[in-house]
């Protein structure tokens, strides 16, 4: 399974805590941690300061409390915990699957489970709210999808259409049809 992993497992950039304006990058690869920093200052003594870089193996990072503190100060303890997990070989394989495959899997979940999954990460939030997923859900729950339904879904989105009850859906479809008929009469 580790062969599925890309070379770069995680990357984050950020600014140091106030009053610092320094810029930082943390890059986790399959074999090492790379911590980079750029000194940002208006003071003349820092104008010629070169960017810095520290490279450590995963094992060395787990023993380097100084670098761990720097990561926690700049990026927070949640990021530090995540980096610990990556260094210990605890990878989030599910998150790394292709969107297409994840959408196929998510289609089989109950609506409550989809709602819960959407709260786990920004990637799953995007997928769980995507029109592609909700179009598949609507297709699996409806016998037929009419052209009017497709047109309505194009305007309001498949998720919103699914969540709208049948009476409202029929009313909106009728209003759209009336508007189209009125426009056709005006053009004639």
Curated annotation (Swiss-Prot):
Organism: Mus musculus
Chain ranges of the F-box domain: 91-137
Protein name from the UniProt record: F-box only protein 36
Purpose: Substrate-recognition component of the SCF (SKP1-CUL1-F-box protein)-type E3 ubiquitin ligase complex.
Claim: Magnesium is one of the keywords in the record: no
Key words, A-Z: Ubl conjugation pathway
The organism's place on the tree of life at top rank: Eukaryota
Subunit description: Directly interacts with SKP1 and CUL1.
Alphabetical list of InterPro entries matching this protein: F-box-like_dom_sf (IPR036047), F-box_dom (IPR001810)
Presence of the UniProt keyword Cell inner membrane in the record: no
């Amino acid at each position: 399974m580790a062969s599925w992993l890309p070379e770069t497992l995680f990357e984050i950039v950020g600014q140091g805590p106030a009053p610092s304006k320094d810029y930082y990058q943390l890059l986790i690869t399959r074999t090492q941690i790379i911590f980079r920093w750029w000194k940002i200052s208006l003071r003349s003594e820092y104008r010629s300061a070169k960017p810095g870089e520290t490279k450590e193996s995963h094992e060395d990072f787990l023993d380097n409390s100084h670098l761990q503190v720097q990561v926690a100060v700049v990026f927070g303890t949640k990021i530090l915990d995540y980096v610990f997990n990556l260094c210990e070989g605890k990878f989030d394989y599910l998150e790394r699957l292709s969107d297409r495959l994840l959408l196929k899997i998510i289609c089989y979940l109950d609506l409550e489970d989809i709602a819960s999954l959407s709260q786990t990460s920004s990637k799953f939030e995007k997928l769980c709210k995507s029109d592609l997923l909700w179009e598949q859900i609507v297709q699996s729950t409806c016998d037929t999808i009419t052209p009017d339904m497709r047109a309505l879904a194009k305007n309001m989105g498949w998720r919103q259409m699914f969540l709208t009850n049948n009476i409202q859906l029929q009313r909106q479809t009728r209003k759209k049809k009336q508007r189209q008929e009125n426009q056709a009469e005006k053009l004639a």
